[in-house]
A protein has these predicted regions:
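A general boundary/transition motif marking the beginning of the first structured unit of a protein
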Residues: 1-2, 13, 44-48
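Generic alpha-helical secondary structure signal
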Residues: 4, 8, 23, 51, ...
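A beta-strand edge to alpha-helix "cap/lid" segment located at domain peripheries
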Residues: 1-5, 58-135
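A solvent-exposed, acidic/Ser-Thr-rich amphipathic alpha-helical stretch
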Residues: 24-80
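Residue-level detector of alpha-helix boundaries and kinks
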Residues: 10, 38-42, 93
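Short, aromatic-enriched amphipathic alpha-helices that serve as compact interaction elements
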Residues: 3-21, 28
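Generic anion/oxyanion-binding catalytic loop in active/binding sites
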Residues: 14, 42, 116
Length: 135
């Protein structure tokens, strides 16, 4: 049951991101959440806590006039580890160039109804490998 509940936590968080509802997102993130971006993605590095999440998000969104995440699937690896496969679309700020990235993966560790870890990767394989290394 915990895995199913955590799938819903991840879905609600990604939906809140698309709405721009930062309060709803923060309510689903542990106060000490670790946010990680794989070296192949933007905003590479590790960010900590709600402030870190906000900084990470702002750095990413500053590059885009429009940006949206479409969730294809949220997969429970076990009771607390999940991977969301998404398609991302956006239009660059200034350039106006439209970009579409398919199959972008987010990894999550969710405990007590809140994400304690969130990672961004270009592939499911990279997300899964990182989750396994963090266990």
């Amino acid at each position: 049951m915990a895995g199913e509940d955590n799938v819903e936590v991840v879905r609600r968080g990604l939906e809140a991101f698309n709405r721009g509802d930062i309060d709803a997102i923060l309510a689903l993130l542990d106060a000490d959440v670790e946010v990680y971006s794989d070296p192949d993605t933007g905003n590479t590095g590790t960010y900590h806590g709600h402030r870190g999440f906000i900084d990470w998000t702002r750095l990413w969104l500053d590059a885009w006039e429009e940006f949206r995440i479409e969730v294809r699937e949220v997969e429970a690896i076990d009771d607390e580890h999940l991977i969301a496969i998404t398609d991302q679309t956006g239009r660059g700020r200034g350039s106006g160039i439209e970009v579409e990235q398919k199959g972008v993966a987010y990894a999550f560790t969710v405990r007590g109804g809140r994400a304690v870890f969130m990672g961004l990767y270009f592939t499911r394989e990279n997300a899964l490998a990182d989750l396994q290394a963090r266990r």
